[in-house]
Amino acid sequence: PLMASVKSFVWYSPGAFADKGYEVPETWDDLMTLTKKIADDTKDESGTKPWCAGIESGGATGWPATDWVEDLVLRSAGADAYDKWVTHEIPFNDPEIVKATDLVGNILLDDDYVNGGIGDSRSIATTSFNDGGLPILEGSCYMYRMASFYEAQWPEGTDVSPDGDVFAFYLPGMTADEKPLLTAGEFVGAFSDRPEVQAVQQYMSSGLWANTRVEIGGVTSANKAVDASKASSDVLRLAIELLQDPDATARFDGSDLMPSEVGAGSFWTGMTQWINGEKDTETVLTDIENSWPTS
């Protein structure tokens, strides 16, 4: 891809964590233990929850919830099952996918855990993903799962750094040794084979261009020649380091690889219905399975 983003990020307030003695989790179980701990610690604080979330995005409402599911399929079922799921070698309602979705539901459908500073779990469906993480700045939410590009959504003047107002940590795998990584990106397409077009395309795939663009700011790149130290921010530097980590098991955003009827259709709407409590996990996943094109 020309540019890339890391989706396996959890945004948080380093200061709030330090004040409460919370540590960045290293495993999924650690994350769930931390979630329960925060819920217990804040039960007397009206409106404060461990997590905040938002999946509203106009005609694309639901896509942030699909990212959650993809991250958990990659973690709980593994890369091989993830690949088979994306290519429909296993059905959308396979038991492994049901399990992964229910793991997401352990957070997003639990009113004790969401939606900090906003409402209950169903408010997630009407909260813009752009606004979903902002309660962290108000102290009414402690964590928000969203990609590296969310850095641009924080209000002007927000200190985004390891010791600042907000930062991000890697969404942990099931064990500390595993490093599944959900990614996304944009691609360059050539519509002519003229020499000058090929020359531009070759240049845009070079380490020189990637390093120059990363240094300008606001983006990351999966180009292996990129020097992470050239990144314009600490978050983007962390994203590049994760993309280049030889121990990471990286996979591209699954919904982007699925047929559009599913990846940009029934998967989005199905997850929105699920968040709204209209359908349970198996019903939603079966509906999505039945929407998969036969040819």
Give residue ranges: language-model regions.
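Extracytoplasmic ligand-binding clamshell segments of periplasmic binding protein
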Residues: 57, 78-157
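Short helices/loops that flank or line small-molecule/ion binding pockets
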Residues: 16-19, 33-42, 126-144, 269, ...
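Bilobed periplasmic-binding protein-like "clamshell/Venus-flytrap" ligand-binding domains
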Residues: 40-60, 115, 210-217, 294-295
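Short, solvent-exposed loop/beta-turn-alpha elements that line the ligand-binding surface or hinge
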Residues: 55-59, 75-99, 156-161, 173-181, ...
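Extracytoplasmic/periplasmic substrate-recognition and gating elements
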Residues: 20, 143-149, 155-220
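Periplasmic solute-binding protein
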Residues: 1-29, 54-85, 182-189, 262-272
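Non-transmembrane alpha-helical segments in soluble domains
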Residues: 9, 14, 32-39, 70, ...
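Conserved C-terminal helix/tail region of periplasmic/extracytoplasmic solute-binding proteins
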Residues: 18, 40, 241-295
